[in-house]
Structure formats: C-alpha cells, structure tokens
Amino acid sequence: MNFNKLFVIVLLAALAFFGQAEAGGLKKFGKKLEGVGKRVFKASEKALPVVTGFKALGK
C-alpha cells in the first residue's frame, strides 16, 4: 500500500518537472537567431551573383 502511494507521488512529481514548460527566454532567443539567419541568407543571395560574375571576369 505504501509503495502505491509513493509511486503516485513520484509520478506526479515527475510530471510536474518534466511536463510542458514555457519557452520564455529561449523562444525570444530563437526568434532573434532566426532573424539573423534570414538576414545572412538574403545578403548572401544578393552577393553570390556578384562574386560569381567577378570570378568569371578573372578567368
């Protein structure tokens, strides 16, 4: 009987600790990182044709 009570308490504690949690700060950091990635991607899209054209002129 005591084992069942202990098992239920441990199970509830595990659910409380390992359940869904708010992303909070990590979500904000992820959004900033995603924005940086988009800006780098767009800049590389603009610069890549210039670089390949420059390489072609150098041959």
Swiss-Prot record:
It is found in: Secreted. Its main location: secreted. It holds the Pfam family Cecropin. GO terms for biological process: antibacterial humoral response; defense response to Gram-negative bacterium; defense response to Gram-positive bacterium; innate immune response. Residues 1-23 form the signal peptide. The modification Leucine amide is found at L57. The keyword Secreted applies. It comes from the Eukaryota. The keyword Signal applies. GO terms for cellular component: extracellular space. Keywords: Amidation, Antibiotic, Antimicrobial, Immunity, Innate immunity, Secreted, Signal. Cecropins have lytic and antibacterial activity against several Gram-positive and Gram-negative bacteria. Belongs to the cecropin family. This is Cecropin-A.
